[in-house]
Amino acid sequence: MPTSTPSPVFGNQEFHYTREDFQQVRERLYRLTGISLAESKAQLVYSRLSRRLRLLRLGSFAEYFTHLDREPGEQQLFVNALTTNLTAFFRERHHFPLLADLARRQLQRHRPLRIWSAAASTGEEPYSIAITLVEALGSFDPPVKIVASDIDTGVLDCARQGVYPLERLEQMPAPLKKRFFLRGTGPNAGKARVVEELRQLVEFRQINLLEADWSIAGELDAIFCRNVMIYFDKPTQTRLLERMVALLRPEGLFFAGHSENFVHASHLVRSVGQTVYSPA
């Protein structure tokens, strides 16, 4: 009896790509990161991973999975290729006045501020946090510690450099651009770099949120974990939220993304603003 071969997900592709290939990618990514890829992401997966196949000169996704199993270092590159890195300076702008108010209150108590940006991507979020604190506290040497982490080592390298195309700064007020960025010239024309004083306020680390040890000390004043939870299933969301809330001070703030809500976790957090929560 003849056996049928899996049909490609899309026609006329450079690499043969089946539903089985996509399901295997979904399973591997979930196992490594806890991220649940939606069925609608099949084309995105092909686009991202086909670059790896070309670079490695592999002929099929089956060959790539074999390579993935044989080369431990490829797992991180696999994760880097598939994790989404959509970000912007002062994204979800309504969060930053609340952070500034929190900073001023803590300064009055003579208490240093500790903040974790848990999905830092290419750095726009932690640098927006740093700018907010410098502006609120009136000093380039504020009593703050900002830890910024991501699972993707590639974006963290970009974040540490702090170099961005000028168009990324288009929506930023001119005084902030002038104070916190250096405009490139010559071969760096069309780019801007975060000033060194601001870069020194942020410590970048590679952290997989599914790891048992985050190496993040407690008593945090704020955690930014925005537009991350949507990639996890509800049980994983609850486990992560429980761990993060345990790191916050009682008056600390948890900043979530615009498409996230934690109605299912009201025993852990209470809403104190638009997508802003405190420990319950």
UniProtKB/Swiss-Prot annotation:
Residues reported in the UniProt entry to bind S-adenosyl-L-methionine: 85, 87, 91, 125, 150, 208-209, 226-227
Superkingdom to which the source organism belongs: Bacteria
UniProt cross-references to Pfam families, sorted A to Z: CheR, CheR_N
Family annotation (InterPro entries): Bact_Chemotaxis_MeTrfase, Chemotaxis_MeTrfase_CheR, CheR_C, CheR_MeTrfase, CheR_N, CheR_N_sf, SAM-dependent_MTases_sf
Gene3D superfamilies referenced in this protein's UniProt entry, alphabetically: Chemotaxis receptor methyltransferase CheR, N-terminal domain, Vaccinia Virus protein VP39
Domain CheR-type methyltransferase: 10-280
SUPFAM superfamilies hit by this protein: Chemotaxis receptor methyltransferase CheR, N-terminal domain, S-adenosyl-L-methionine-dependent methyltransferases
Chemical reaction(s) catalysed: L-glutamyl-[protein] + S-adenosyl-L-methionine = [protein]-L-glutamate 5-O-methyl ester + S-adenosyl-L-homocysteine
Alphabetized UniProt keyword annotations: Methyltransferase, S-adenosyl-L-methionine, Transferase
Keyword Transmembrane in record: no
Record EC number: 2.1.1.80
GO BP annotations listed: chemotaxis; methylation
GO molecular function: protein methyltransferase activity; protein-glutamate O-methyltransferase activity
CDD domains found in the cross-reference section: AdoMet_MTases
Gene Ontology cellular component list: methyl accepting chemotaxis protein complex
Purpose: Methylation of the methyl-accepting chemotaxis proteins (MCP) to form gamma-glutamyl methyl ester residues in MCP. It specifically targets the McpB chemoreceptor.
Subunit structure: Interacts with the C-terminal pentapeptide GWEEF of the methyl-accepting chemotaxis protein McpB.
Name of the featured protein: Chemotaxis protein methyltransferase 2
Organism annotation: Pseudomonas aeruginosa (strain ATCC 15692 / DSM 22644 / CIP 104116 / JCM 14847 / LMG 12228 / 1C / PRS 101 / PAO1)
Gene: cheR2
